[in-house]
């Protein structure tokens, strides 16, 4: 704590580091399924999480005379958490590991953009090759989910095996709890009257959008992210690589275009 200018200015600054152990977790991944637990897997005190950050507050109070006063204040809190130990086993690839990630982190695929018609044509030519020629000709892109067309989302093949699958998922989203929260404001006083304002903000909070937030006309137009950005979409006439909506398709996500409904960086906001 620090006070200056006859205690008009007050500064409080704290640094913290916490290691929390014996966190109760359900052991649904670390116990083999052949043991018969299934959804009734036992809990165990096996989790370890580390938090570190800082907290600061600055406040200035000034009385100019018997009528006028001014108070200015600001605060900021920063916290970064990460898994040290948990119930997940070590993964095949480093990018899949939970440890070192924040506790609300979400996995998904890395989107590299939208497919162009040229890329789709290149894949069609590659598919028409004989097996011998395929072995010596690089595959234009990794196999995605179902049959993809121009305007569909293209995902990154992290392990370079030519197939997008669970081994290409990595942590892409921190979750909806921000790492930083801040605020500032003032209060101006005159006799028995006062005027105050306060501003608040957050930083580094993310969410993977799904459901009605990414499906135009979801619920018959009564719900869904429809009116604000319906024109911000990929079309053959407007092949915008940065469109909010990739190629639109008709029907349920599981039968019509499963590729564009995968959790990915394309949907992180």
PLM feature segments, named:
Residues 1-4, 9-17, 54-62, 70-78, ...:
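Membrane-embedded beta-strands that build the outer-membrane beta-barrel scaffold
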Residues 27-37, 87-97, 212-222:
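Flexible, surface-exposed loop regions and adjacent strand-edge segments
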């Amino acid at each position: 704590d620090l006070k200056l200018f006859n205690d008009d200015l007050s500064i409080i600054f704290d640094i913290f580091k916490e290691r929390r152990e014996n966190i109760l977790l359900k052991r649904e991944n670390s116990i083999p399924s052949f043991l018969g637990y299934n959804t009734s897997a036992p809990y165990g005190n096996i989790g370890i999480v580390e938090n570190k950050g800082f907290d600061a507050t600055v406040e200035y109070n000034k009385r100019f005379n018997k009528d006028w006063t001014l108070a200015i204040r600001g605060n900021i809190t920063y916290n970064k958490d990460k898994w040290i130990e948990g119930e997940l086993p070590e993964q095949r690839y480093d990018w899949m590991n939970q440890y070192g990630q924040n506790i609300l982190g979400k996995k998904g695929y890395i989107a590299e953009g939208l497919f162009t018609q040229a890329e789709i044509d290149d894949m069609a030519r590659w598919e028409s090759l004989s097996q011998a020629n395929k072995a010596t000709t690089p595959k234009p892109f990794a196999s995605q989910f179902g049959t993809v067309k121009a305007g569909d989302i293209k995902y990154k093949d992290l392990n370079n095996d030519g197939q997008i699958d669970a081994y290409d998922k990595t942590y892409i989203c921190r979750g909806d709890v921000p790492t930083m929260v801040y605020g500032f404001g003032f209060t101006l006083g005159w006799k028995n009257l006062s005027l105050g304002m306060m501003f608040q903000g957050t930083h580094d909070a993310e969410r993977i959008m799904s459901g009605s937030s990414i499906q135009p006309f979801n619920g018959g137009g009564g719900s869904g992210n429809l009116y604000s950005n319906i024109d911000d979409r990929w079309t053959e006439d407007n092949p915008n690589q940065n469109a909010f909506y990739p190629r639109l398709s008709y029907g349920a996500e599981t039968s019509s275009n499963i590729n564009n409904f995968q959790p990915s960086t394309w949907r992180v906001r």
